[in-house]
Swiss-Prot record:
Full protein name: Ankyrin repeat domain-containing protein 49
Location (main, coarse): nucleus
Chain positions with Phosphoserine modification: S49
GO cellular component, as recorded: nucleus
Source species of the chain: Homo sapiens (Human)
Subcellular locations according to the entry: Nucleus
Lineage per the UniProt record: Eukaryota, Metazoa, Chordata, Craniata, Vertebrata
PANTHER family documented for this protein: ANKYRIN REPEAT AND PROTEIN KINASE DOMAIN-CONTAINING PROTEIN (PTHR24198), ANKYRIN REPEAT-CONTAINING PROTEIN-RELATED (PTHR24198:SF165)
ANK repeat spans: 73-103, 107-136, 140-169, 173-206
Gene expressing this chain: ANKRD49
Phosphoprotein recorded as keyword: yes
Tissue expression summary: Widely expressed in fetus, at a high level in fetal liver, brain and lung.
Length: 239
């Protein structure tokens, strides 16, 4: 579910890198880990792609067919529906069994994580209204806020922060949401949101001893935004 499996500067992320053998099966990988591929982000490919258009043009019948296949596994269906922005399905499943709201997949992602990284605000709102845990962490220690900030889903990140998400939560690699936003070249809005929050601690370091500003200075054209916190007590490298 984590859409990120490497840094944007081409350096593998130490807590998310995958070690593939020479003969790994790509189709099998897509089948088992397809949820790790971003569904709400823009591609850098500028050409025309009939295949991409076909992907975007799946009709209601296709979605209902997929739901029917998963109907006997409501937890799996809820995770899928949250990622695919199927609000009616999410509501139906939670009305039948509200405890599924915090169900998890094999990587410990919850429906809220999936909706957050996909940028589906309506789903996020519904899940939180039904008791979704904004502090839930994956096997790598990612919260839903990490997922939203990594993929520049600013409105989702803002809503999560309004509902007690920890802006300074750190993953197993000691990455904060600000670290992840700083490593995204398209994250201007999310960086502004985080840096203008009175509780943000931009001086926190990851396990490579880097602050978010260090990452932004290396990878982002928006490193100047860190001037927002320059001179603030929170901007000193302290936890």
């Amino acid at each position: 579910m984590e859409k990120e499996k490497g840094n944007d500067d081409g350096i593998p992320d130490q807590e998310n890198s995958l070690d593939f053998s020479e003969h790994f099966n790509q189709l099998e990988l897509l089948e088992t880990h397809g949820h790790l591929i971003p569904t709400g982000t823009q591609s850098l490919w500028v050409g025309n792609s009939d295949e991409d258009e076909e992907q975007d043009d799946k009709n209601e019948e296709w979605y209902r067919l997929q739901e029917k296949k998963m109907e006997k596994d409501p937890s799996r269906l809820l995770l899928w529906a949250a990622e695919k922005n199927r609000l009616t399905t999410v509501r139906r499943l939670l009305s039948e069994k509200a405890t599924h709201v915090n169900t998890r997949d094999e990587d410990e992602y919850t429906p809220l994580h999936r909706a957050a990284y996909s940028g589906h605000l309506d789903i996020v709102q519904e899940l939180i209204a039904q008791g979704a845990d904004v502090h839930a962490v994956t096997v790598d220690g990612w919260t839903p806020l990490h997922s939203a900030c990594k993929w520049n889903n600013t409105r989702v990140a803002s809503f999560l922060l309004q509902h007690d998400a920890d802006i300074n939560a750190q993953t197993k690699g000691l990455l904060t949401p600000l670290h992840l936003a700083a490593g995204n070249r398209d994250s201007k809005d999310t960086l502004e949101l985080l840096l203008m929050n009175r509780y943000v601690k931009p001086g926190l370091k990851n396990n490579l001893e880097e602050t978010a500003f260090d990452i932004a200075r290396r990878t982002s054209i928006y490193h100047y935004l860190f001037e927002i916190v320059e001179g603030c007590t929170n901007s000193s490298p302290q936890s």
